[in-house]
């Protein structure tokens, strides 16, 4: 292939990737703006099922309980929908590179939100409770508390130490790190999470200003009828006030959007610590994260980790492997390479790899945690999480140099936003 043909092929591939990125962003936005209608459909289902219920069976229930439930679902959907539309309206310039794409044809399936997109909206609302509601305080204490305490133990708060928080979600852990006097940058890949965290951090909300109803999607395992329709108010604190409480002048806080390995591909020995919570198992191949964190840490730097090994890219159906491999073992069109190359490791295997990379394990213990748990549900998932600190040995005689502004590489869809 000639150089001209190679350049043309690369340009075509980049254009296709950018177009797909725009369609993906449209699906995310559409899932936010279409959330209310999706929940209202559940209210209609309740009404239809109630209408078919035999009168003698309906008489066994509290008076009008099903009608009240349907009305409550609609009211909760409207409140959540208003919040999600505000998130979209407040995104500013945040989005794919090149600005907003031209409107897609309504029939174009690439621009239409899928059930997976709506599922991520529901997960984002649950994460609002975990990170930004008083109801999530106990879960934050169990998950974030040990990490924050360990950072203070192993990383000096000298005004120069910088901590990277990959898989930052809605950014509460990053904010708590910065509030303790560290420079902190969070990294997140999900547009759903990034849009919502941008709004919560930068919209100037007052404490407990917004009432969300995050558990309307959980009709099962309710102890009381009202539990499903209860409100959680966000944010429990004003982000800027939390940062100011850390003292030490202007806080060093930012969020970087994009896939972890790509965003930080060109950085080396740039961070004093990496604080990871429920993150390692998001990798198709966790060994790549181990190698990347080693490269990113300065000599003497610490990797503080808490989380399970619930690997995200384990194929659960044939649809995950749709397209598969060609005769030469290469992914075909339509196949998600992350499913195709995913490898899962036990803790003892991952521990061996961490030590083989060169880390020294200075803490290793198990902690019970939940993740976006509904505290009033009759069913919750309890994780027995590995909590460890791995230190990159300091080179003998090396004088460590603080890097206040490491070089960043942003691929498609990457951006940075800071707390106003």
Language-model segments: what does each one mean?
Residues 238-240, 341-358:
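Short alpha-helix
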Residues 1-157, 161, 170-171, 179:
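N-terminal accessory segments
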Residues 203-265:
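S-adenosyl-L-methionine
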Residues 357, 371-400:
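Core SAM-dependent methyltransferase catalytic element
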Residues 401-420:
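Single conserved hydrophobic/aromatic residue that forms the stacking wall/gate
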Residues 288-299:
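A short glycine-rich, Lys/Arg-flanked "PGG" loop and its adjoining helix->strand segment in the class I
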Residues 300-310:
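Conserved beta-strand signature within the Rossmann-like core of class I S-adenosyl-L-methionine
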Residues 273-286:
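A short SAM/SAH-binding and catalytic strip from SAM-dependent methyltransferases
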